């Protein structure tokens, strides 16, 4: 095995801490319960360290509950009830991709309030919408000291193996709003399919047949994005309208993002069957679409109608007639906290749960909600 040298510069973590971190990352990313790890002498050779240093690193991983030592047999990945019981701390992690803005802040307040009522403390982690920062925060969760975590993941799948590792090793997790595609786990969020379906159906009922969907298709992908796309598509199908992939458009890389929306909207309006409505993934796309329509001399809603998901019913766009799908952040935070507590205390339902909150439709053209 290739020797992996440790950093020995001033200010670097102690050698055992570096080994501990490397092994922790490898366990979470690719090991299963019962897998045997390499003997200490092999690890010492690999890291260029003495066996006492390796033994100390492994000892800490045993304390974290990731490993279990079996006399005469070796050291194995724990799981499935093996290893020492996790000490209860009545402390819960709250991992968010960002903490500013109405949507995350209301979920945070609601979750913290519900947890506090049950005498749980919270530790807030802000990944700043970075998959690397999120990976660091997930590693901190694995180090122990927490009973569980509420997680709103970054809208990219890079850390799915780390999430799976935490679940595999028994840390209670509940995902907020979304989770990586293909990952099994508890989720509490908006009913994204229904919100997209209802909004698109309203546009169709007003006579629109060429409806674009401005969304992420490749770079960012998670359950909420996928469910909104499926809701949009199903509404078209149920109303006898063929789904046109050309009308589903992801943002592209331009020096000025608004140029993308302008050029895309101009392209979709170019022929004798122009797009007459747009359903947007979220309110930032709505803002860009309104700017693009203005730049092209299009009036809303006379020339083109715009709909999309919003974080709250009151918005700077209130002077523009936009159909809004409003998410219930307070309910999401409260329900997620309740589900996490039930998992921690052992009284939760069998199997992973997906709890959805029905969004509110605010339609200025019909005067209805």
Q: Predicted segment positions?
A:
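Beta-hairpin "wing" of winged helix-turn-helix
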Residues: 31, 36, 64-72, 76-79
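Flexible loop/turn connectors
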Residues: 22, 262-369
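Amphipathic helical "hinge" segments at domain boundaries
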Residues: 17-21, 29, 82-147, 218, ...
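Extreme N-terminal segment that seeds HTH/winged-HTH DNA-binding domains in transcriptional regulators
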Residues: 1-48, 56-59, 86, 109
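Periplasmic-binding protein-like
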Residues: 93-94, 146-153, 212-215, 272-282, ...
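Short acidic capping loops at alpha-helix termini that bridge into adjacent secondary structure
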Residues: 210, 243-247, 300-304
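Hinge/beta->alpha junction and helix N-cap segments in small-molecule ligand-binding domains
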Residues: 96-106, 125-133, 188-198, 214-264, ...
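Flexible loop/hinge segments that line or gate small-molecule binding clefts
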Residues: 152-198, 218, 284, 310-322
């Amino acid at each position: 095995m290739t020797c992996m040298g440790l950093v020995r510069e001033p200010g670097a973590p102690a050698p055992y801490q570096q080994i501990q971190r490397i092994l922790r990352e490898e366990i979470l990313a690719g090991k299963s319960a019962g897998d045997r790890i390499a003997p200490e002498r092999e690890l010492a050779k690999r890291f260029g360290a003495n066996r006492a240093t390796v033994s100390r690193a492994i000892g800490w991983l045993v304390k974290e509950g990731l490993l279990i030592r079996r006399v005469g047999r070796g050291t194995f990945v724990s799981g499935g009830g093996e290893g020492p019981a996790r000490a209860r701390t009545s402390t819960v992690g709250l991992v968010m991709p960002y903490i500013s803005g109405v949507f995350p802040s209301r979920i945070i307040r609601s979750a913290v309030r519900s947890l506090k009522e049950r005498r749980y403390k919270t530790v807030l982690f802000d990944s700043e919408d970075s998959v690397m920062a999120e990976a660091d925060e997930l590693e901190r969760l694995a180090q122990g000291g927490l009973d569980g975590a509420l997680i709103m993941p970054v809208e990219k799948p890079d850390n799915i193996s780390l999430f799976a590792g935490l679940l595999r090793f028994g840390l209670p997790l509940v995902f907020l709003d979304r989770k990586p595609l293909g990952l099994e786990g508890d989720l509490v969020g908006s009913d994204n399919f229904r919100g997209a379906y209802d909004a698109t159906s309203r546009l169709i009922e007003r006579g629109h047949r060429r409806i674009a969907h401005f969304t992420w298709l490749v770079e960012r992908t998670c359950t909420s994005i996928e469910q909104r796309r499926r809701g949009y598509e199903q509404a078209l199908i149920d109303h006898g309208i063929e789904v046109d992939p050309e009308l589903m458009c992801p943002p592209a890389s331009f020096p000025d993002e608004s140029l993308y929306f302008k050029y895309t909207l101009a392209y979709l309006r170019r022929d004798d069957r122009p797009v007459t409505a747009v359903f947007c993934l979220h309110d930032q796309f709505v803002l860009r679409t309104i700017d693009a329509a203005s730049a092209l001399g299009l009036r809303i809603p006379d020339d083109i109608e715009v709909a999309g998901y919003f974080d709250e019913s009151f918005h700077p766009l209130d002077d523009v007639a936009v159909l809004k799908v409003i998410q219930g952040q307070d309910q999401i935070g409260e329900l997620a906290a309740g589900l996490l507590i039930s998992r921690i205390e052992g009284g939760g339902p069998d199997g992973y749960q997906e709890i959805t909150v029905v969004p509110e439709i605010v339609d200025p053209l019909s005067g209805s909600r």
